[in-house]
Amino acid sequence: MKFKLDKYKLIHWLNIRKVTKHKFLLECDTGLEQMDLESSKMFFEISSSSINNIVNYLSLKEDQLAYSKLGHDEIGFIFQSKEELYKTKRLIKREGFDFYNYYTLPSPKGYVAPVILDILCPNEKLPKLNNGHFEAAITINLGPGPINGRWGKQINKLNFSVLESNLDDQTSWITGSSYFEPSYCPHTYSLASSQPAKILSYTVANTLDNFISDFNKLSQDQQINYEDSISKPLVERIISNQMSLLGFTEKTLAGTAELPLDIVSSFIKGDFDNLAMQLIKNLCSIMNLDFRVLLQPEITGDALGKTIFSVENSIKSKRIYKNIEWASAASSINSPDLTGSFLKVDNESDGTDLSNLDFMYFSKNSHYLVTSGNILFVSKNGNEVIEKLKLSKDDSLWVKPYQSHFFIGRGSLIKMSNGEGVDYTNDFSLGNLFDEQNTVKRAFKDNLGWGYD
């Protein structure tokens, strides 16, 4: 089987390794009579032995050079019909009885996708808790009935609550209550009446996934040192780690900054109450520390970290954007990439004249579930040709970041987004770039070599 070698990734790594294109082609057996790195080709098909030669030459892993663009990257979306959704059904049993049916919405391979759950645990049974998971989540009641949410062993207002469905015909596109769930929050659900009920839950990839995966590789000695490090509060830990990285002690930092020791001591402990922002920035500058990482957000939610958003709260949030009515679902500033919205489409058209359509695009991945009506999904493919797709209840879509699209017709959807591949921490890195706009433009399909050919 041929390996698809990504030309831009190859050139990028040649630059990192300080190897000219000419030297690479001269010294490394690519298995090709000619590999024109100046051509418009995006990838080269080579043998397994050839890619082995290249990764050994550049000290890389194969996946670091693999061409990964797929069909959905070009058209910008993945569609899943209701029939395909139903085929993903799998039953979960707990304590000997049917507990949930799970269904999975579409997403690219390797991505996290929202799931729909049929809540099967009857109202008279106390649902058994799970152990929670590292990833945060938003969960929305799809109705038609209410559900019980349980988040702790004791049964009280904090640990046990009804997530209502929306019984108002005028606002039924807002299907029900929703809530944000933090990391490792135990949770479970049961029916809260004789009515059936479903939920839509989006358990998203965490921006710390790679960080945690790498730390699971620590040796015993490394783990001891890491656990010693995290015994300090986060801000103090960040400052202490940066000081040790550059060989600063409390005294030498105070001496370099020409500041009294007690002021520097307060800074190191994260006690900023009596410190001016400019002083904090100056100390960070000495240590080459981005001061923004010291500005910690407030941890929101209740005593368990969860945030429940009622139907009434969603109704109050209604607004118009791009000729579509929107309403908010639960969210948390502690997980800014994870968002949920209810959308009402009421802009009937036969779809023949789309010349003046005000397309929308978003900086994050978007998952859509149609909850009512008949809707026309309109999009642009890679050649700027208009694509149309008819949608009805329980059809679903994944739409790529920056993909132009729109909805026409009468109906409703739920939209969920996360930052997988485009998370908000990128914005901090972009903010650190010199000449940010031109730098990012250059990085897109950068075909320039090291410059010493």
Predicted regions and their residues:
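The DNA-contacting recognition helix of HTH DNA-binding domains
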Residues: 21, 31-34, 62, 250, ...
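Double-stranded beta-helix
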Residues: 192-235, 410-453
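A short, N-terminal "cap"/entry segment at the start of jelly-roll beta-barrel domains
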Residues: 60-118, 228-229, 242, 277, ...
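Helix-turn-helix DNA-binding elements, focusing on the entry/boundary residues of the two helices
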Residues: 10, 21, 51, 62, ...
